Amino acid sequence: MSATGIGTIRLQIMWNRLISVVEEQAQTLMHTAFSPIVRECGDLSAGVFGLDGRMFAQAVTGTPGHVNSMAESVKHFLRHFPIETMNEGDAFITNDPWMGTGHLNDFVITTPCFRNGKAMALFSCTSHLTDIGGLGSGVDATDVHMEGIYIPMLKLADRGVMNETLLAMIRQNTRQPVESEGDVYSLAACNDIGCVRLVEMMDEFDLDSLDALGDYICDTSEKAVRDNIGKLPNGEYKNTMTIDGVGDPIDLVATLTIHDDKITVDYDGTSPKSPKGINVPMAYTTAYTCFGLSCIVSGDIPNNAGSLAPFEISAPEGTILNAPYPAPVCSRHVIGQMLPDVSFGCLAQAAPDRVPAEGASCLWNITMRGATDRAANDSKLFTITAVTNGGTGARPIKDGLSATAYPSGVRGTPVEINETVAPIIFHRKEFRPDSGGAGTHRGGLGQILEIESAIGADFELLAAYDRIDFPARGRNGGGNGEAGSLSFTSGEKLLGKGTQTIPAGKIARFHT
């Protein structure tokens, strides 16, 4: 049935209902996940896709880097496993950084949804597993295979029967076998819940197919975004952002072109790929660039294949923003999450009254690893990622947000959760006074955190931070934000990137 045969009001109701379906999918993932970074912080994505791979709806809960790159993952799944070969009860999995969401820690599971024996849609989801073997989270690897288990596109479940061989491989290649396997099951479960709710919706609205609704969603969204772009002045706008990198600074160079009803962003001139694990696969570059554009151009339009269609993103292969296999990519967020601010620097020239100043941009996740007990024969290790944020840039008509993860959108991990799941103690967690750049509206404040072992033992800090040498810049005459830093409370500095030991009795201090 065509969209015109259903009626606009009914289509709009079904669109909103579909968004609620995928939001329940995401909430199921949060409520069943084992890793605190998922269940407490929402480092995930969830969405429903047409049989042709178009994204029809995404959950409100989730990160842009996962959602927009997961949309590409579904297309890869369909190329490997055509829809006509899928059966009810099948599920497919990968953590391939170039076909998934940018690094090995993110597992993507895609599941076909059947109704009355016929495939109706695909549900897909992503979440971050804290430990997947290898060197662990950080920048130290020099190729992707050092960073953990690498799962190609495989069948996780065949007609409802789980692939126990694959699960055994996952368990054996992680320092957290119970948590990792549990997270895989939570991903599969959330897709199943999404399918159940979709079938209920289709029964309620007497739908035999999602084609008409999907066409309406994508066509309506694309037209709305193109109309908004058409209100901006045509032109070519350039911006360069310099950030810390590893060893040498990195230049992120963007040329944004507005031409009638479309926007292209080209990163030609950006620094080459790094020998360390801060490289970014193209899908992740596209995801965060599109998110930055959407925030200014189409913030009130739901995210789907149609709303993304007017944006075209490119970066020369071999640059840090289009790093080919087997480049190390574990900490790709350190670079990729800068890209909305890079695109804002371009858009500020076309729409100066709508664009915020630069913020902390990338997360300041405090990833720690060590023994759970001081006993020398204790073989059980803890691995934890305490999600931590700086502040956002000042907005055109109000201050920036303090201690807020933008652009990732994840929540900070509560201190109580960190101290419950790992033998660490937080002596301090508070706003960092005067850290937001001054101006008519100031930037959001960062944080001060102080952390020590709770059992008098050494532990490792897997550092991957930025904005230390090159702080966030103000806009339109506003002041820069304060630079980040990390050190011991006794004064000795710690490196912004790289695995380091925090000795027993020492307190590590972080200024975001």
Provide a role label for each language-model segment.
Residues 1-88, 93-512:
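Glycine/proline-enriched, intrinsically flexible loops and inter-domain linkers
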